[in-house]
Amino acid sequence: MANMASVTYAIEGSQKNLEEILGAICLAMTDKKHWTEYKACEHLGFSEQELDGKWLGGEIDDNPTLDNGVLRFYAEERWGLQDFEELLRQKFPDIKVYWVVEERGNEVYCTNDKEGKYFPERYWVDTAQDDIYNSEYFSTEKEIYEWLSKITHGRVKCKEDVEKFNSDYEDSGANDENFIYIHKFEIEGEEP
């Protein structure tokens, strides 16, 4: 079974091009609820031969938005970023496609938004303390440790404290789940 990745897109371009992409996405969602990325590419005029061998198994959510020259949408894609972005750039060479990918099953956290224009968060922190679960996104390590200090009542203030926190609970044999995981978004892919 495929691990599903959450992919969020922010696309800049001319109003005409963005409306064409949005229209294709909306048509794809009315066709079927499966393979909406593939269907959107068909509606953009790609032939079956052009799509053959491409990874286009993503499902685009029901709420794409076009506002102030930016098309935004979210997709669930199998194993991570697929070929949808590449095909959009091929059809519309003047667009800029920004994305962020989270695939928690294989610990994949990445973005091509180097400057943080649309996706400024660089960390996702996942915690459990006495079976109380929390997760937050952060732009800086300083923000992470301020938040962790608050939720751990001052116990965790730095990287070494995180390691100690995790080690203490692993060594204790306690039945409750206690952990702190800090996931960093890597900068990858072609810049928009």
Outline where the language-model segments fall.
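Exposed alpha-helical structural elements
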Residues: K16-I21, K39, E143, K164
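Short, extreme N-terminal segment that most often corresponds to the first beta-strand
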Residues: M1-D31, E188-P192
